[in-house]
């Protein structure tokens, strides 16, 4: 009897112990389902946050965009239709929240401007060449040897005709070199003002010289080859009156400029070794030699001779 009660009591205790276990199972499943549902709800949001999390890093990065633009312009002129092409490069850089844009011309000088300059050179060259042909034909027509043999030599041509042909040649070369200097000065963003005065007016007050004209020395030597008396103008490095400024050559030997002018009977400048008209260079240190400043005047002197 006691054994049966003990067995029954043991069975009831086992059932009471099993009930809480069974009651915890639904709770466990409910908790698991709840957190799984929350995890499923938060997972897309987390994915969105994680995907958006790269955007600030992308903002701190850099993005470069280069855009090439070609502009073609049609110009109607006397020679027909001319096409001018301009190339531009537009660069856009994005760094964080700042956006910088840069546009630059791919060519250093505008092709249209360069074409116009060389068109003017070609027109002048054509005109001078026609004049040279006219002078040459007139010389040949006056040569008796040309009528006999159909050939003429320089020794059979009069000095006046040879001088006329030489003037045409010098004018052709001088015009070409002057326009070439203008093109080079424009490409280097420099400015040169030529003083085209004639006899007795050799002032250089308007002659503003800037750097990047060192190649003009060889051009002045070209004209010095025709007149030996101008060779004394070659060996002097500078004509700037900067005696009190270091780094500038002295103008003690400027009297050689009077030798060139004395060849044609012009006013001498020997009494003025340091002219005040060159004081416009005081604010510009380190000016290179610029011997082409008398190129135009010398060409005028050649014509007048």
UniProtKB/Swiss-Prot annotation:
Keyword tags: Phosphoprotein
Biased composition (Polar residues): 92-101, 209-221, 231-244, 294-305
Phosphoprotein is among the record's keywords: yes
Record-listed Phosphoserine modification sites: 39, 158
Organism the protein comes from: Rattus norvegicus
Entry-linked InterPro entries: C10orf62
Comp. bias regions, Basic residues: 1-10
Disordered, as annotated region: 1-30, 92-114, 197-305
Biased composition (Low complexity): 197-208, 247-293
Biased composition range(s): Basic and acidic residues: 16-27
Name used for this protein in its record: Uncharacterized protein C10orf62 homolog
